[in-house]
Amino acid sequence: MKILIIFIIFIISYISGFEIPKGFGIGLVIPDAECLNYIGDPIDQQLCNSKLQNNGDRIYTTTNSQIDSQTNIKKSFEAITFLQDQCKDLLFAQFGICDIYLAPCIEVTLTPLKSISLPQRFCKSVCDRMVSNCPRLEEQMDCSNSFLFPEIGTFYDLSPYGYTIDNGTFAVPCSDPTIFFNQVSSNSSFIEICPSPLLLKNSSDPEYAANKGYSYLSPSNCVLPCPVPNYSNQKWDQLLTMSKILSTISFILSLYNVLTFGIINKKVSDPHKCTCFFSGSIALVNLCDIITYGIGYEELLCPEPGRSAKQQLDPVCGLTGAFFHLGITYCVLWSMTMGLVLYCSVKRQKWFKFNYFLIGNTTFTITTVVIAAATSKFEAGLGSIECWIRDRWYAISLFWIPCGIALLIGSFCIIAVIHEVYKTSKKSISNRNDLLQRELKPLLIVIFISGSFLYLFIFFFDIERKFGGYRSAVEDYVLCLLNGSQEECFTTGPSYVPYFLFYLVIRWFGIIFFLFYGTSNIARKIWVQNKIWKSISSSISPKSTPKSSPKNSDSKINSNSTNNNNMILNDNNDKNLNEKKAVELESIKIN
């Protein structure tokens, strides 16, 4: 395009026989152009109202050119908003940009009834000043182009329009807004514009301080939207839908385990207590999700545009964050305790005291919750679907390191249990199939508990390792927005599939424990022996039997109940092996 313009100017000069004086450029005449007043800035965006010479009177205007110019000015202002740490005198640059796109206009009278409008092009000296103060502007401004940036002025050939003075040429001096800038700059301010979906906030205003949940993109006052656009809206919807469905199911099944092993169970053993507390912990984690989607994910996590929820400003975020931390920490500690219970049972050790672990687990968990709450560390953060501890060192100190140690202990205990099961079975049972059947359940527990938490650990520390790269990649996101391409722009973050799996793992524990424990033989026996269940069975049984007297009916029910109890006892006697080791193995398998 630039070569084409130079070629046209050369042809015009050659045909007219006019020699261009030094310091001047040759301009093209647009017959339909007019000198009009500035239409004014858009209602919702300040641009050039206070930055135009002569208050914006007589602006060179072609068809829709002022609207198009405003679009270009807005894009230029967006770009230099992010150059504040690389450039100086950017306020002057904005005056220059307004003068370039909304050029002053001179009207030349050709005849009493006819005139033509010509633009005053931007002076090269002013262009050089802008580029020297901000070298990045050189990418968009070629100050050596005399057509756009003449040193003195621009010659226009008006002979085709009937102008005869000076061989039909008319000289228009270049525009220099320096004097005007010096007069009004003290009353003018630099205009920051953030490309959508970034939002403009005043970081110096305490109401919009960074510690209130705003994520500023230095050196500007632009903040990232909430939630952060790491993924498309479709992927966010998939993640939130998964969370709603799994959390609800997991919550119900966890309560079932608590009811079965902790409330209606007549003989609550130590393994049953561990199962009960573990399931209760998972229910607490899922309750946070239920509260969150009950209120609304964006309403709770992003209470204001561009602001993520913080404990000190958003009490519900602090409450759900405390519940989540209490639940997930308790969950890890009780998984460790379950491993110790199984190990002591197989080794026939007497040192395990359940109440000690109950006090220890509860004390540690509550202490970490109190520390996090007292220091206001519960917040939504960037790109998350629940409130929790987002401060890096607090999260590592209060959860990942201590709970990682607990998981390691629990995993070693469960591995030791499997080893003891193998040794005992080898001595007393020769059938390999029976050996595999006995080891299958604890082996699956190891895979699902330890493996799941191991994935959470790896994912978290992998994000921490790459966090610096994610932050530096924000520049690419901003460039994508500034380029105005048709493609959707995203910030750089964790890959979607591992991120989705991270939240999936946290929410499947209730379902997994129901499959392990809620469907076990001992769970069914607990319900069969429950008084309420018996009364329901008794009320249903007569309806399916022939008519008889009440006494006979009661006698049959009692007889059936007695027979059922005898059958259960006989089944239990059949299942108990003569050797004590085999009995212990059966107990481990059930629990």
Curated annotation (Swiss-Prot):
Membrane topology (Cytoplasmic): 266-275, 343-353, 419-442, 517-591
Residue ranges, annotated region (Disordered): 538-573
SS bond partners: C35-C105, C48-C98, C123-C174
Coiled-coil region: none
CDD domains reported for this sequence: CRD_FZ (cd07066)
Keyword field contains Membrane: yes
Key words of the record: Disulfide bond, Glycoprotein, Membrane, Receptor, Signal, Transmembrane, Transmembrane helix
Cleaved signal peptide residues: 1-17
Molecular function terms from GO: G protein-coupled receptor activity
Entry's family note: Belongs to the G-protein coupled receptor Fz/Smo family.
PANTHER family: FRIZZLED AND SMOOTHENED-LIKE PROTEIN B-RELATED (PTHR31787:SF1), G-PROTEIN-COUPLED RECEPTOR GPCR FAMILY PROTEIN (PTHR31787)
Protein name as catalogued: Frizzled and smoothened-like protein F
Organism: Dictyostelium discoideum
Gene: fslF
